[in-house]
Amino acid sequence: MSSHYEASIRKPLIEGDKSYHDITVDIARPIETPPNKDWWIAFSIAVIAFLWGVGCVIYTIGTGIGSWGLNKTVGWAWDITNFVWWVGIAHAGTLISAVLLLFRQKWRMGINRSAEAMTIFAVIQAGLFPIIHMGRPWLAYWMFPLPNQFGSLWVNFNSPLLWDIFAISTYLTVSLVFWWTGLLPDLAMIRDRAVKPFQKKIYSLVSFGWTGRAKDWQRFEEVSLVLAGLATPLVLSVHSIVSMDFATSIIPGWHTTIFPPYFVAGAIFSGFAMVQTLLIIMRKVSRLESYITLQHIELMNIIIMITGSIVGCAYITELFIAWYSGAEYEQYAFLNRATGPYWWAYFFMMTCNVVSPQIMWFKKLRTSIIVSFIISIVVNI
């Protein structure tokens, strides 16, 4: 009787027994062919949402940031909550690409492009809120430590707003370089298939002369690993800095040291849910069912379930520390959340963030496209 262990054969990450040529044709099809009906529907919804957002920004700048609910007693309103939300969903892209690359998880290859692109646009969106929050966005450059003609006027390095500027700009730079580096082979592939001279010229510029030589691939892997090593601690540090916006205040219920790990776990949680939402839509719109498989969706759901449990543990820890502290103001802050006028929002949050991901314990549910899409939307809410 043999005593050694034989691992079972893993399921292929790409379905359909496709050749390299088949993969190239399928991946290039959305660029080389006219958009289908599903794409136009998704694009129309995105354009409507974009125009709505532009209108809201113009109204806010014209009316004043008081329209967001900000006043002398309310310092955290529509702007900072949306800022944290966008930064949070931006973290999943770097985490999927960087951490899973370092751990040699091959299943990242089907979803990392979408996640990285989501990161870039989410970080840009997040950066808009501190700028608008200033009330005078045309003076946003004042947030940078630039030489000026106002004598001793300088940025306040003790301000969380300045911390956010450094965190967001650094994260955007590293994420952009990481995303572009990963795109080089794909851009070169589209360059070689391009027919129109203008398109060929553009793709030649953005692919940086990639030829596919062994030396190119060697440098590609080395740079990818270096960037992944830089981006991984960046994921942890950026949202820890964002959490300091709240943790450095003296308001009961907010002045707590649990915020950095709690915010990081929540960011990964919401970010993976947003990636799941986009992947399910994209696999349908772009006909990529063979590349974004049920195996990818199931693994994403497992991570959502784990991070949702971590967030739930953080909620319970907050309540316990408030009780254990014996500080009546701290206890009242948490008791008011659960029993005060906004009790319904508190329990709705607990249901969405803690209870709903637990159904992913059941394999039949976590491999269901409809259930996965609904849960990802619920978590994002």
Which residue ranges define each predicted feature?
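Generic start-of-chain signal for non-secretory N-termini
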Residues: 1-44
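Transmembrane-helix bundle segments that line or gate the permeation/cavity pathway
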Residues: 2-18, 58-69, 73-76, 83-214, ...
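The first (N-terminal) embedded transmembrane alpha-helix
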Residues: 13-24, 45-52, 86-92, 233-242
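Long, contiguous internal "core" modules enriched in hydrophobic/ aromatic residues
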Residues: 30-57, 152-349, 362
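Hydrophobic alpha-helical transmembrane segments
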Residues: 87-95, 348-357
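Membrane-helix interface "capping/anchor" motifs
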Residues: 106-107, 361-372
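Central hydrophobic cores of alpha-helical transmembrane segments
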Residues: 371-380
